[in-house]
Amino acid sequence: MADITAELVSVERLLWTGKATMVTAETTEGEIGVLPGHEPMVGQLIDNGVVTIHPVDGERLVAAVQGGFLSVSENKITVLADWSIWASEVDEAQAQEDLKSERELTRSRGDAALRATRRLNS
């Protein structure tokens, strides 16, 4: 099976690097899926998006992201997010509280976290 090298990096940490069969991300142009052999491109992530990685040897990984970019080159995709959290790390009660925050950034991150959790559980 063909694979692509994938990296998910936030400003704070490297979340994942490895071989994947597909990566999907929500960009300002819509949701895209990147498979091995994809044409080179650069995209801007939406402010409260979800990235899904389908590793070659494991279950799919879902992360909430806050802004950033993705870059696709020959057989490699790099997702660089301003902020990111794995759906499996989300405290759903806290994310629900974040939706009530007066700070727009906090509300957006809460929304992204809950969307990632729903995607993981679907």
Swiss-Prot record:
Chief location: membrane
Pfam families xref list: ATP-synt_DE_N
Keyword Nucleotidyltransferase: no
Basic and acidic residues: bias regions: 97-112
CDD domains: F1-ATPase_delta
Entry GO CC: plasma membrane; proton-transporting ATP synthase complex
HAMAP family hit by this protein: ATP_synth_epsil_bac
Family from the record: Belongs to the ATPase epsilon chain family.
Its job: Produces ATP from ADP in the presence of a proton gradient across the membrane.
Protein's name in the database: ATP synthase epsilon chain
